[in-house]
Amino acid sequence: MTPGEAPDLLTGLPDVPVRWSAMVRDAATGAVLADHLGSRVLRTASVGKLFLLLEVARRIVAGDLDPHEQLSWTPEEWVADSGLWHRLDARRLGVADLALLIGAVSDNLATNVLVRRVGLDAVQAMARSVGCRDSTLLDRVRTDRGPEHPPTLSLGSAVELSDVLAGLHRRSVVSAEVSALVLGWLSADTDLSMVAAGLGLDPLAHDEADRGVRLVNKTGTISVVRVDVGVIEGPGRALAYAVLAEWEPGQDPRDDVLDAMRSVGRRLRSAAGA
């Protein structure tokens, strides 16, 4: 499939009242197959946690961070919403378990503890080192975000995020070992509500091929944002995608947004040969 043969992969993404940034790449080569305002920078909610996972994986592989090191949260770091740790009795968990919680349920509390452990500056340096100029994690997760804090958790563009996902598929982001670690964490993602909804997979168990399809993805959700980035690997080919949607406060086009994202997922499944 060439770019000229894939004009319809990202149809149905109207810009009113939603701002989109979307791109599909051949995961094996990185070639752009479809582009809908892919350079537009939008809020990406929890997708910026991807760069935290990359930095944690880099340190584990380099021997600079023990995956079994036990970490606990402080009252200042405590936050609820996405995740499970804030519901668990365990006050201490290992580094690798925290990374898995982020990959599986986008755990906010695990995010804050790992950001403290490796440093936000290092996470942002990781984003730059993998070629991202606009996509990064801006802050830790906060229950209340004031004027003294970054205005949002993360920003990104489809052109950069799809490139990172394609690189992960090729095991070329930082190193093959780092890429494999991050892919393993992301393969546990339970949020298949967006693009991945078009694949018909079991949201709780899809690390093995189902109907010839394998998926790794990371999503982000806040009241005005839905984002899904990932790799769909089918019998015919592997496709890296990033679909970002943002709208103004007071609007609620989420049903239309989710319908459009699900339709993209169905087209990607077909394009992957499944």
In which residue ranges do the predicted regions lie?
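Structured C-terminal helix/loop/strand segments within mature extracytoplasmic catalytic/sensor domains
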Residues: M1-P14, L33, R171-V195, A209-R214, ...
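Beta-lactamase-like hydrolase cores
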Residues: M1-R43
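Mid-domain, small-residue-enriched loop/turn segments at the edges of structured enzyme/sensor domains
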Residues: V16-W20, V115-R170
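Active-site SXXK
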Residues: G30, R43-L71, Y241
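A short glycine/serine-rich beta->alpha loop
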Residues: D35-R43, L84, L88, P147-P151
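Short glycine/serine- and small hydrophobic-enriched flexible loop segments
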Residues: L54-A62, R116, D163-R170, R269-S270
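Short, glycine/proline-biased beta-turn/loop segments that scaffold the active-site neighborhood
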Residues: A62-L88
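Conserved catalytic neighborhood of penicillin-recognizing serine enzymes
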Residues: W78-N112
